[in-house]
């Protein structure tokens, strides 16, 4: 089930990472699993979740449920971003910039999953610093959520959209 998509209503789900963890006790080790998943509708809503359990399927299901509860709205400009955006979480830094139509998603593993499920089709993206998938996903979603549409910016500044767009 690694890196595959499933339909859950109108939501697409993607498994980003499954990690085996161990708790050391007097009698030996107790193994458990953590799962990182991303959920999106492909048209501007995306979320991520982490699940922990003793069995892989249970961890994945918990992560999917959490991802559905933690969705954010992303302001897109057609199939790309409104403007270049930077974000960081921990030691992971991400930079995403709009790309012309037909470019595709040029981004690394964990970032690619988030961008695909958010509905972005053309973007140039780069991850700097730590490439820990959890922090990269968090930074990517933080950056996407921080974007504002030109209409919102114009309303806040008391200007017209044409003045903002230049």
Swiss-Prot record:
Keyword 4Fe-4S: no
S5 DRBM domain residues: 11-74
Record's GO cellular component terms: small ribosomal subunit
Swiss-Prot/TrEMBL keywords: Ribonucleoprotein, Ribosomal protein, RNA-binding, rRNA-binding
TM regions (residue ranges): none
MF GO annotations: rRNA binding; structural constituent of ribosome
Taxonomic superkingdom: Bacteria
Coiled coil: none
UniProt keyword RNA-binding, yes or no: yes
HAMAP family xrefs: Ribosomal_uS5_B
Quaternary structure, from the entry: Part of the 30S ribosomal subunit. Contacts proteins S4 and S8.
Function recorded in the entry: With S4 and S12 plays an important role in translational accuracy.
Protein name: Small ribosomal subunit protein uS5
């Amino acid at each position: 089930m690694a890196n595959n998509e499933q339909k859950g209503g109108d939501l697409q789900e993607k498994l980003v990472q499954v990690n085996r963890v161990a708790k050391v006790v007097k009698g030996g080790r107790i193994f458990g699993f953590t799962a990182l998943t991303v959920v999106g509708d492909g048209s501007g809503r995306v979320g991520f979740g982490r699940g922990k359990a003793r069995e892989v399927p249970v961890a994945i299901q918990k992560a999917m449920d959490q991802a559905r509860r933690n969705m954010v709205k992303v302001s897109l400009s057609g199939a790309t971003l409104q403007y270049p955006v930077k974000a960081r979480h921990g030691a992971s830094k991400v930079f995403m910039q709009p790309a012309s139509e037909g470019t595709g998603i040029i981004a690394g593993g964990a970032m690619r999953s988030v961008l695909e499920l958010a509905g972005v089709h053309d973007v140039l993206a780069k991850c700097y610093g730590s490439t820990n998938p959890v922090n990269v996903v968090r930074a990517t979603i933080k950056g996407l959520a921080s974007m504002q549409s030109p209409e919102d910016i114009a309303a806040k500044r008391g200007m017209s959209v044409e003045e903002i767009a230049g």
